[in-house]
């Protein structure tokens, strides 16, 4: 589902039990808190956490394999420059791998093992190291091609994009 800021604000108001409003009485104040601004801060915090940490099945995934180039470095290594709006890499598969790569952070023990040619990953258990916008692949050869690269992408400003099940992660304020 893809929601605009106004639509997302409406969903949050409903989930926070701030709507539906009673229409049989009117109260007017000018010294109150800007509820919409406060809710928008909570929405943005929730959404950033959602994009970065929530299980992939709750998010919209984009295959960017056709939009990027794989630079083969030899010795079983390659690099890919990720698109600017890529928030998180979820799945990587090369044409000659037996399974998708294990995706790790650059400071993980498995990533550090890739620095040594003797402990480096192979085709049977490839490794992908995500370091900001650079994806380092291990277990590739000169004929390898990127067949799948699924990413969580930052949507256009003013929009929120996710699976409807992600709404269940909204907590009460």
Q: Which residue stretches match the model-derived regions?
A:
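Glycine-enriched, solvent-exposed interface loops adjoining structured elements
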Residues: 1-126, 130-173
